[in-house]
Amino acid sequence: MKRLFSVVLALLLAVQLPARVKLPAVLGSNMVLQRNAEVNFWGEASPRSRVRVTASWDGRTHETRADASGRWALKLPTGEAGGPYTVTLSDGEPLVLDNVLVGEVWVCSGQSNMEMPVSGFMFQPVEGAVDAIADAGMYPGIRMFTVPRVSSKTPLDDCDAAWQTATPASVGQFSAVGYFFGRMLYKALGIPVGLITSNWGGSTIEAWMTVEAIDATPGIDHAVAKSGTYDNSIPQRLYNGMILPVCRYTAKGFIWYQGESNRKNWYDYKALQVSLVKLWRETWGDGKMPFYYTQLAPYRYEGDELRSLPLVIEAQYRALAEIPHSGIAATTDLGNPTCIHPARKREVGERLAFLALANDYGVTGLPAPAPVYKSMERDGNKLVLTFDNLPVRAQNGVDSFVAFGPDGYLRPGGFEIAGEDRVFHPAVANFKYWDNRIEVSSDRVSDPVAVRYAFRNYLSLIHISEPTRQAEI
């Protein structure tokens, strides 16, 4: 009897039982797949087994074979936006993903101002949070995936997370900037939007890059760039633990809000920003993925009059000129002198969305991009500044770049000019909206050679922006 039992057991073990396909967390029910694309599917199955993937939007079955270790990958063509659909995978036993939508997918990343949830941080609320949470159920086509905080010495290929549908119960803990960005896309395009957020408060840009990418960045202080000692500042740790687990997921583009933790090496931030964008596009396998980022918002830091913040902001704008398919959302009017996490996250998310809508979806009539300094010429005791994208409508309309100053006239504020001595003095500015120019002058500077705008950590400006953008020089 004992021998008979052993023979039967051996025969049972010899039978190849069907195994269920295993997927990474980012491929799951409730997800949004990028429309009109060949999206990546990958995972594990029985070694050398045939893996079949069938999507209900067209009923077609796509096949591939797992390698000797059980790993497999294939491309799944999507069509126009729509859903909900099912995706069925099998190497013998079916695995069904349901409530799948097809639409637009964006990756949202950065440090705490991107991480800040709709419900806010303790004693640091998000303006309009209650309304945003209450009406979240009106946007069932918004789906959210939050990569957990993981700092890893080695590359990871998965994470512990799941897609969620926008509801009052789920939205409160999701990135506020990310959610408001996605909500505006959803409202403007009328199609599903998938948002993947990967954020860590206090993180440096180097933590989101590979060591090789940092080493290949020319002209920087490599020792400082690699001097991080914390989980969120050591080079490559967050790239390994929070980017690689989702980097194969097909997406449209990126939004980014980071830089506060790089004030110590502001002089290298432009080059590092350019290198990060190049790296991420290579990692996703698409060198033209749009990359939109947020100007750091005003905050006192070491003091109102000090300048660690505007030096980083200047680096952000200089990077813009070297990053194709990019844009920046200005926040000069959205800061807070005593809270590093300002409350007006809706405006930040929407300004980023306006950039995407204008540049990637062909939506016209939006206030994007922000005015950007183009050139300067001298006219006697005045400096005449030329901008791209200055508003061209009436000075006192809702799209005005200016407000009434103390003298009762509409004037831009925050400008300073200097002569050869480089001592800056407050300047009077006149808005020449009809030809995209601003004239600045000061009674204390007869021969001006330099101009700057809002060049301090925090400045209460007398002018207002359009509701959606601010100018930078």
Q: What label would you give each PLM region?
A:
Residues R20-P47, V100-C108, E115, N359-S375:
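Non-catalytic, glycine-rich low-complexity segments
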Residues I462-I473:
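Single conserved hydrophobic/aromatic residue that forms the stacking wall/gate
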Residues E104-V105, Y139-G141, L189-G194, Y249-G253, ...:
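Loop/turn elements at helix/coil->beta-strand transitions in domains of secreted/extracellular proteins
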Residues L9-P18:
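Hydrophobic h-region of N-terminal signal peptides that target proteins for export
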Residues M116, M122-P168, L189-T229, S233-L238, ...:
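Surface-exposed loop and adjacent secondary-structure segments within mature catalytic domains
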Residues W42, S46-P117, F121-Q124:
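Extended acidic/polar, glycine-enriched regions
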Residues R35-A37, E347, A358-D407:
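Surface beta-strand/loop "capping" patches
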Residues K2-A10:
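Sec-dependent signal peptide recognition
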